[in-house]
């Protein structure tokens, strides 16, 4: 038997690559008259397929051998209509037999253990052929991140019981708080808020929730991949039937598209939940990076890390993303721990997406860091190598996040909005998407995702409360924290780049000071729709800023001339002020923007530039731009903890 280190030596040899690299189709190829299964297993001595009628339980209907072909591919033809039949492979490698699902499975039974052959058009939602990716103007590209479970788990959300915490909750129209007909929730709330995209936390099949058990006491964010090309069963109304999760996932996407909202998929190719997974059971050790002794490298912090630089691993990742883009009409992809992928793989993926019809509209961005030390010895897709990435691959900018609200690893560390001394210097860098700074080697502002909160770490509200108080009352409507929340939003929603927000940030979402709730209770993680109604003024503030931003396209421009056009004022510290002229012919509602940030608890007097300026937002109301003109000039007052915005008329 080979040792893990010997497998590593083999897999990294040029001879192995020449003999086994394969560019053709893999997985099930369905036809009404028969289905062909193809599996890449170059180190196997024998491969067979086990056939089942059900996704769990029941006896095996029979076992058939696969034939070995060139480049490490095995295949078998199953005559007759195989739609709805389940299967596993038994792969014998170096004297050990592994029973596993198909790495290229399109759907599966309970907990993803058995793959299912699927005739997708047979079960697609009505008019699915007419669904398409949404074209979102750059000025409306704001991302709202949510878990499928969190979106509608609250009993007060107004969604029917059977759909709560499921894909189908995104399809129900007309929901209101406690079904009282007043405050809109879920899909109707999103439409009113005005975001351009919803980023869904993992919706592929993950292993940390048991789909065969009630979900009452189970919860996980889902960063535990089991089957990359299969929707998660616990989000369907019937995880025992493989076709249901596929159809309902597509219904969710179609509903969001019909509402004019794009769908971004959070993908986690950097690691898998267990080492006993379809990839490692098919070709042990190949798909995961190894330490010199052959053991798994752990740059993900989850026990293993995907070897994107190995040719067939790269093919798998690209094939999978293409499948979701084409079969599910996904509008964008957010890459978890993108620093664990090599630059070449990410750039090849970007080029491959661009080659699809309409593929240049598909967004690509990710976390430009790792979860630990890695054995990736090629250029990593991280912040340091941003200049090597395609200009159309973006990154989460933790520089912007930390300067605005304070570091995420120290609960008490303040940022600019909490009065951190000297932080105003870096606010200017954030406004210009760091394109006028040597901190980040960005090609253009469109590479920068500007944000202050995401699912990781403290919610924005909890962070503000932890900095302000030794013993925070998280549920209280604290007026000072509310003002700081508005200021934080006023800053990053006027920064260049693409804004991003955690769902509920706009209504002071709290997790009671817990910074990592990936497997905490459903009640702690779910969106609190009563709180959304309670903090409706804050919701309206975000809504107004989103609308204002859409009226001034240059904030979302991708050219490097736009950051260079920002003019900063010399003001009393720690105030920050700047102007940006509209780009010629971009349809902006105002000739220029003039923005001031006041992070102090006092009113401040400043002088506007020459000209006539309309007050668009005063730091409390962000919808003044919609009303009658209030023309300002000369000296004006900035409210405490405020972002004040003027438009030149």
Residue spans of the language-model regions?
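Glycan-recognition and catalytic regions of carbohydrate-active enzymes
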Residues: 19-24, 485, 494-514, 526-593
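C-terminal accessory region downstream of the catalytic core in glycan-modifying enzymes
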Residues: 52, 477, 481, 527, ...
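Conserved, mostly hydrophobic/aromatic
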Residues: 39, 89, 146, 200, ...
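Substrate-binding/active-site clefts of carbohydrate-active enzymes
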Residues: 149-328, 337-357, 374-375
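Conserved alpha/beta catalytic core and glycan-binding cleft of carbohydrate-active enzymes
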Residues: 118, 350-351, 355-356, 360-507, ...
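C-terminal beta-strand-rich structural cap/linker in extracellular carbohydrate-active enzymes
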Residues: 41, 84-87, 628-649
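The feature marks proteins involved in alpha-glucan
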Residues: 1-32, 68-172
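Carbohydrate-binding surface patches
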Residues: 29-45, 565-609
């Amino acid at each position: 038997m080979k040792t893990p280190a010997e497998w590593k030596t083999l897999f990294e040899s040029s001879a192995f690559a020449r003999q086994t690299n394969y560019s053709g189709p893999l997985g099930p190829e369905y036809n009404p008259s028969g289905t062909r299964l193809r599996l890449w297993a170059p180190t196997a001595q024998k491969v067979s397929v086990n056939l089942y009628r059900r996704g769990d339980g029941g006896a095996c209907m029979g076992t058939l051998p696969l034939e070995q072909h060139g480049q490490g591919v095995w295949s078998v033809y199953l005559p007759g209509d195989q739609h709805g039949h389940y299967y596993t492979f038994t792969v014998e490698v170096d004297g050990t037999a592994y029973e596993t699902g198909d790495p290229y499975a399109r759907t599966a039974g309970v907990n993803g253990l058995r793959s299912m052959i699927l005739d997708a058009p047979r079960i697609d939602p009505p008019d699915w052929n007419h669904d398409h990716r949404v074209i979102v103007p750059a000025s409306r590209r704001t991302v709202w991140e949510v878990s499928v479970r969190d979106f509608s788990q609250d009993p007060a959300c107004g969604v029917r019981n059977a759909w709560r915490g499921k894909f189908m909750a995104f399809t129900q129209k007309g929901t209101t708080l406690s079904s009282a007909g007043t405050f809109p929730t879920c899909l109707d709330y999103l439409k009113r808020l005005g975001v351009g995209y919803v980023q869904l936390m993992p919706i592929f099949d993950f292993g940390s929730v048991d789909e065969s058990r009630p979900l009452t006491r189970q919860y996980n964010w889902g960063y535990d991949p089991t089957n990359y090309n299969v929707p998660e069963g616990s989000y369907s109304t019937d995880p025992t039937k493989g076709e249901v999760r596929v159809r309902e996932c597509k219904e969710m996407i179609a509903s969001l598209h019909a509402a004019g909202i794009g769908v971004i998929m959070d993908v986690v190719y950097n690691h898998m939940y267990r080492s006993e997974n379809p990839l490692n059971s098919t070709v042990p050790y190949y798909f995961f990076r190894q330490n010199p002794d052959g053991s798994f490298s752990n740059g993900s912090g989850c026990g293993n890390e995907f070897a994107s630089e190995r040719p067939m691993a790269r093919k798998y990742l690209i094939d999978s993303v293409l499948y979701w883009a084409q079969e599910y009409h996904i509008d964008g992809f957010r890459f978890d721990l993108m620093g664990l992928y090599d630059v070449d793989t990410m750039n090849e993926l970007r080029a491959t997406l661009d080659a699809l019809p309409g593929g240049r509209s598909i967004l690509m961005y990710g976390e430009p860091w790792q979860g630990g030390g890695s054995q990736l010895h090629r250029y990593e897709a991280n912040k340091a190598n941003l200049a090597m990435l395609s200009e159309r691959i973006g990154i989460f900018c933790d520089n912007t996040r930390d300067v605005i609200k304070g570091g995420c690893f120290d609960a008490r560390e303040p940022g600019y909005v909490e009065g951190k001394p000297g932080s105003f210097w870096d606010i200017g860098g954030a406004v210009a998407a760091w394109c006028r700074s040597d901190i980040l080697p960005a090609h253009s502002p469109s590479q920068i995702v500007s944000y202050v909160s995401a699912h990781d770490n403290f919610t924005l509200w909890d962070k503000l409360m932890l900095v302000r108080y030794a013993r925070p009352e998280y549920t209280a409507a604290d007026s000072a924290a509310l003002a700081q929340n508005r200021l934080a939003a006023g800053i990053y929603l006027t920064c260049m780049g693409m804004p991003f927000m955690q769902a509920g940030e706009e209504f002071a979402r709290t997790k009671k000071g817990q910074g990592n709730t990936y497997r905490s209770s459903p009640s702690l993680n779910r969106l609190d729709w009563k709180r959304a109604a309670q903090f409706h003024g804050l919701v309206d503030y975000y809504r107004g800023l989103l609308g204002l931003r859409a009226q001034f396209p240059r904030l979302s421009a991708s050219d490097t001339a736009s950051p260079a056009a920002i003019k900063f004022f010399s003001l009393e510290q720690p105030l920050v002020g700047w102007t940006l002229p509209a780009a010629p012919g971009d349809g902006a509602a105002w000739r220029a923007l003039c923005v001031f940030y006041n992070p102090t608890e006092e009113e401040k007097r400043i002088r506007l530039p020459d000209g006539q300026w309309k007050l668009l937002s005063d730091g409390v109301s962000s919808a003044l731009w919609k009303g009658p003109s209030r023309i300002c000039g000369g000296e004006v007052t900035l409210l405490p903890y405020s972002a004040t915005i003027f438009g030149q008329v």
